[in-house]
Amino acid sequence: MECNIGDIVLVNNFKYPDGSDGSLHSFVVIEIENNELDLMPLEYLCFLVSSNKIKENLPYNIPLKKDSFNRLKHDSHVKCDFIYDGIRKDDILMVVGTVTPNQLDLFWDAYEMFLDDLDEV
């Protein structure tokens, strides 16, 4: 399926960082090279396992409020502390919506802050 940087996509199959299989999850496309995508996971607030207040305060979780542009059904967070890479365009079921260039910049800034914090440890 065709998609662009900044699109919110529903992915059919992917691998979690621990190697286990994942399916039917939403992501934001942050980079495209050839037929492979780099993605940041999007989490609906109601799906977060621990307290929403704790998750909202994590510096690498950037809130994404639902609106007509991104076409989300619920307010969400983009988890900017991990990039899923090598996802094939064939694994995209649908494009849900899109984020603004400013929001995409915020996601990259949060990821860079995460990497900087890792370097300090």
Question: Where are these predicted regions, by residue range?
Answer:
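A residue-level detector for short acidic-glycine micro-motifs
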Residues: L10, V29-E31, F82
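Compact nucleic-acid interaction/catalytic patches
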Residues: D18-S68
